[in-house]
């Protein structure tokens, strides 16, 4: 090895080739940088293990060692990024803001180190000028794998689903009193009783009004005019709507929530004069507001035997009271 180095150094100084052929030039071979710095020209092939200045601690050799370590770390980082891209777990690195950049000058301005406060990656710039010791180079080798492993852990933690973010998609409806977003006009809940037709009970009788979801909690009470029968709410949830008195929408829940749920209302389809003696008394008994607070709708079940017996008992008592009143008035007239 020593003879080869001496011959290469002589040919470099004299410019003569050992082959003696002046017309041909030998192909350019990579030379050892450490040997070149010490004044020797040694081919790099097969020379890495046997270099005399491999463990040299001089100024030039320490710079070469630091450069080799930085290049090896960069190659390892590129290889890891390529593997992450193949696996599909890489994510774009956000650009740092100018306020987050912190430039630290070390060793009296000899080398600059660029550090990011918020991001998980940290890039170190290669030293341009100045001198650094070998201990600094060893610290770089120890720090770079820890930085890459920390960045890998933080990148995997970002893949976890953020539950508060996805829970914001499920919000309560904007209009809780409507089934959908369309504001349909409320349907008519008024009943009119014609006073001209004496025997017609069509305004009162008819098919029962039932709801598949809930019972109507309001009562039919005569208005001030006396001809219209409107529904009266316990709590007016739509006070802001400018609707007339005969267009009222029922509330969703009963105002008496503590009491038991009433049975569905049963309205008779027709009324006969055999059970009820007079039309005026029937009108007064059917259309009077209820006294109990359990149900808001008048319930007259003609199918049950109890209701039939009660109506017959009322019908029997009313003629007796009329006959007693007639006898009292007749006796008073005879006395006069």
From Swiss-Prot:
Family matches, as SMART domains: DM
Location of the protein in the cell: Nucleus
A GO cellular component entry from the record: nucleus
Primary location class: nucleus
GO molecular function: DNA-binding transcription factor activity, RNA polymerase II-specific; metal ion binding; RNA polymerase II cis-regulatory region sequence-specific DNA binding
Chain intervals with Low complexity compositional bias: 113-135
Family: Belongs to the DMRT family.
Protein name: Doublesex- and mab-3-related transcription factor 1B
């Amino acid at each position: 090895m020593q003879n080869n180095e001496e011959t290469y150094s002589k040919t470099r100084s004299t410019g003569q080739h050992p082959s003696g052929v002046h017309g041909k030039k030998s192909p350019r071979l990579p030379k050892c940088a450490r040997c070149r710095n010490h004044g020797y020209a040694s081919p790099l092939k097969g020379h890495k293990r046997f270099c005399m200045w491999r463990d040299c601690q001089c100024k030039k050799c320490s710079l070469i060692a630091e450069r080799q370590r930085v290049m090896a770390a960069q190659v390892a980082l590129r290889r890891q990024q390529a593997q992450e891209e193949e696996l599909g777990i890489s994510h774009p690195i956000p650009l740092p803001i100018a306020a987050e950049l912190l430039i630290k000058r070390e060793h009296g301005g000899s080398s600059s180190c660029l550090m990011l406060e918020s991001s998980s990656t940290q890039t170190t710039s290669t030293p341009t000028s100045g001198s650094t010791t070998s201990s600094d180079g060893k610290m770089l080798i120890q720090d770079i794998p820890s930085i890459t492993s920390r960045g890998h852990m933080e990148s995997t933690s970002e893949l976890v689903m953020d539950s508060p973010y996805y829970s914001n998609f499920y919000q309560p409806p904007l209009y809780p009193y409507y089934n959908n977003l369309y504001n349909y006009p409320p349907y008519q809940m008024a009943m009119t009783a014609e006073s001209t037709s004496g025997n017609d009970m069509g305004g009162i009788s008819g098919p029962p009004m039932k709801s598949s979801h809930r019972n109507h909690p309001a009562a039919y009470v005569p208005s001030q005019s006396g001809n219209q029968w409107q529904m009266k709410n316990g709590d007016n949830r739509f006070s802001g709507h400018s609707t007339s008195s005969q267009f009222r929408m029922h509330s969703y829940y009963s105002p008496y929530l503590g009491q038991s749920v009433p049975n569905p209302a049963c309205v008779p389809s027709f009324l006969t004069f055999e059970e009820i003696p007079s039309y005026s008394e029937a009108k007064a008994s059917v259309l009077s507001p209820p006294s109990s607070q359990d149900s808001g709708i008048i319930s007259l079940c003609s199918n049950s035997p109890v209701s039939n017996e009660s109506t017959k008992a009322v019908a029997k008592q009313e003629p007796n009271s009329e006959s007693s009143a007639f006898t009292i008035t007749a006796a008073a007239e005879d006395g006069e």
